[in-house]
Amino acid sequence: MGKFYYSNRRLACWAAGKNPHLGGSVEQWLAAINTDSSFRQTVKEDVQDNREQPTAIRMFSWKVGFGPIDNPEKCDWHFVLTGERPAQPTRPVKADEVVVVPQLKKVVIPSPPPPPAVYFRAVGAFAPTRSGFIRATVERLSREREESRAAALFAELPLEYPQGAPLKLSLAMKFAMLKHTTWRKWYDTSDERLSEAHPGGPCLPPPPPIQNPPFFQERVREFCRMKSCARAFALETSLGLNRAWVGLVDIPSTSVCCADGRTTGGQTIAQEADPLQHRVSTSVAPGRAQWISERRQALRRREQANSLQGLAAQTDMTFEQARNAYLGAADMIEQGLPLLPPLRSAYAPRGLWRGPSTRANYTLDFRLNGIPTGTNTLEILYNPVSEEEMEEYRDRGMSAVVIDALEIAINPFGMPGNPTDLTVVATYGHERDMTRAFIGSASTFLGNGLARAIFFPGLQYSQEEPRRESIIRLYVASTNATVDTDSVLAAISVGTLRQHVGSMHYRTVASTVHQAQVQGTTLRATMMGNTVVVSPEGSLVTGTPEARVEIGGGSSIRMVGPLQWESVEEPGQTFSIRSRSRSVRIDRNVDLPQLEAEPRLSSTVRGLAGRGVVYIPKDCQANRYLGTLNIRDMISDFKGVQYEKWITAGLVMPTFKIVIRLPANAFTGLTWVMSFDAYNRITSRITTSADPVYTLSVPHWLIHHKLGTFSCEIDYGELCGHAMWFKSTTFESPKLHFTCLTGNNKELAADWQAVVELYAELEEASSFLGKPTLVFDPGVFNGKFQFLTCPPIFFDLTAVTALKSAGLTLGQVPMVGTTKVYNLNSALVSCVLGMGGTIRGRVHICAPIFYSIVLWVVSEWNGTTMDWNELFKYPGVYVEEDGSFEVKIRSPYHRTPARLLAGQSQRDMSSLNFYAIAGPIAPSGETARLPIVVQIDEIVRPDLALPSFEDDYFVWVDFSEFTLDKEELEIGSRFFDFTSSTCRVIMGENPFAAMIACHGLHSGVLDLKLQWSLNTDFGKSSGSVTVTKLVGDKATGLDGPSQVFAIQKLEGVTDLLIGNFAGANPNTHFSLYSRWMAIKLDQAKSIKVLRVLCKPRPGFSFYGRTSFPV
């Protein structure tokens, strides 16, 4: 069986051939594979599972382009199914041709469709749903008919009033025009096509008659009658221009599609019916709107002037004083202001026209009627952008719409203090999974008055979206509503800030709105999660509601096996918002900078950022190297949304979630190690095999085959302490190494693979450095460990009681041959001379399911005890199913030393001993040993000895055997390692040096002390030691202060700042612009030993946990 070659067409043919019951052509299957990468992977895995079938071999063993089915015009399905090739013809093929006489094609004329039945459904003037023929009729109204109606309406109105007097009409005349224009707008019965499409005519009431305009004498009489109450008349007139008919919609279980919008940016369910705003054509609307606006302003100014004159007369104030008081009150904070800022403040100018490509704020208003509880949750399908607006900006070259902000305002009706709760949930309408579709929710009590919520979804969708009527899906529900079913619960308004963008356009959100999204505060509101909820301060109902929204079920297609699907009925979902996850009530007078904004994202499982595969051999043995995945390459190669966000942000400090999907199998006994190597410290030590001392010295996680799919989180800010750039850098390269810790006892049937998924939410980091991983202090060790795992311990299958030990000299540096492997745990323990207390840890039995053992864990000093009567008197513990244990360290000194002396062994001191009380046992034929892995978590109530070194100098490095008199030692802004070709270098070993080795970056100030001894007599020596501080490099750098010490002085003191322009310096030599120091010797051969000592000042910080093999 040779190599298989895959292509989308071959996979589509395979899927179509295996599923004839599902139907569909090869091209349809090919389209599904081209658009769905996960489906393609599923089909590919099915082919790999059936690669021994002859059909699979005939389809996939050919190189792409040479197979029997690669050419869609000449598919040799006979060969694929039977393996038989057609026999070669024995005579010319021309003899087998059959000449067909062309026939005239018969044209079939289809019969006309039957006429539709008479439509007798009663439709109100402003029903929440409109019939199809009504909508079609309204849309077919031509521009000429609109203009003629507008001209007829204006002909009935006076064209101008002298001296800017406001327009005054009788109420009868206004209502006549209202009824007439509303009827003509929505029900144009003059269209003869209605009668043709619906025999008998539409079932509509007759239009109201148009009243003739009154004579001049009647107008004068009406004006004189109303002059006595001019203020009330002016108020009525102003309200008449805005008067809207509001329908009470009884829709507790009705889906309402609001798919179009005309003047407000989106069609309302309860449509405002102002004739002066709706019965105009697009050509005359701007001038007429200005005409109406001027008259409204004049009317308001006159009304205000009358009110101020009355106020001044009643309070003995001047007119100016009354006006100042009125304006001062108007500048105060208004109750119920919208949270959405004005458009001019929300978007920066873009393009040559110096204006944002966006439209109005409010796009949906409706009245909630009935009790939306239980399964009667109100569902509203809502498109925030009208069709006209889409067409307008499509002509300008825009291709997408971005919903930057969405506001929900709930204005409840009823008695104050009513504890009835009401919740509105906003979701993305084209996403079936509620956890992914959720945008935000707002909950309030009806008795608490107006409440507002604002969300920043950043939702972007194409203008070519075929189902634009359901972009936003709103769910409205209550858990304890008790009002009458015909009562109006609340008025709910939904508004958006949006913009239209093209393929070459950036989003142009103003800095104030961007700051509101980042900091989570806007217009005296508090951000909690990704929702801003504002409720009045001092409400009658205390606390916050606990919402429960029932979302109805439906049918769907579900995969039940490889290339197999079935249609199922899904039950409804319950979407609950607990009170602790909502915004709290706030005082509107609180100063916002004093409020602490919660992070917008509280979880990292948002979307897939990267994906990789680890291949595992069928005979995977211990210490086998399986592969390496570069986290940066996983994200960049995946090219998903997170990678685009990463490119935009540049620097990120994410929390990765790793999910390793593998089939569970308890018969192999396999255990792997996933090692996080952020600084390439162990990469070179891993080839075809990997010693566990290397892989367990860096942050790592154990993966057990018997448990199946594994997941963990990698907090990059916690483990590395610095941000991550979207392109590769010289000082860090985060990788995941996969190695086998304990091999499988049974060889599997074939090699296999595990899929590694990387989830993250990549948001911009505000700085390069985060919280330090460690801050140096002589007493930094507190008894807690992280990632402390001992190499595997193996028990032989024997009847003799076995004993295995794990040493407790945890400050000892592990070794692989002659290589020391510095890790942070041993560096921390080496800060003290010894320790005592109770060790808490866990034992992992990594054997197959048919192995078993009974383990007794005990601590002993200087050897082992094989006397059972004495052994069971020691404080110990049996290893239970979860493997956890707590054992007190036994020592005649109450402590055990942190490190060993030369010639000593682990058993000479305190150790953890594991006795196989019973077992191990296994079925006949098994010869492999039983492995266990021990992890130590902490020392409970530690009894720590004296510090190894208190506040004193550490030996850094010794220079000796100089070969040149003119010697210059360049000491960069790093500490741990140093080499030279002109002298001998010996590095000092101490806890501080080990901490430098076990971190990727470090920064702080070191006090340095230089000491040297001479080869010649003291009186005959000459020369000097010069210490110079510099910045940059030798060629273009800066020279700083310098100190010169006579060689007879034998010592000198200085300091060195460890760090670079970024703040912390990696363990590399002159890699970044930083400070460094040069030590110049003019008589180096006369110096026997030059010793440099260092003492870190308080606050010396380390970033990025790792290890250092040397």
From Swiss-Prot:
Listed Pfam families: NeA_P2 (PF12312), Nepo_coat (PF03391), Nepo_coat_C (PF03688), Nepo_coat_N (PF03689)
Location of the protein in the cell: Host cell junction, Host plasmodesma
Gene Ontology biological process terms in this record: transport of virus in host, cell to cell
Chief location category: host cell
InterPro entries for this protein: Nepo_coat, Nepo_coat_C, Nepo_coat_N, Nepovirus_subgr_A_2A, Viral_coat
GO molecular function, one term: structural molecule activity
One Gene Ontology cellular component annotation held by this UniProt entry: host cell plasmodesma
Post-translational modification: Specific enzymatic cleavages in vivo by the P1 encoded 3C-like protease yield mature proteins.
Swiss-Prot/TrEMBL keywords: Capsid protein, Host cell junction, Host cytoplasm, Host nucleus, Transport, Viral movement protein, Virion
Note in the entry: Virions are comprised of 60 copies of the coat protein.
Family: Belongs to the nepoviruses RNA2 polyprotein family.
Protein name: RNA2 polyprotein
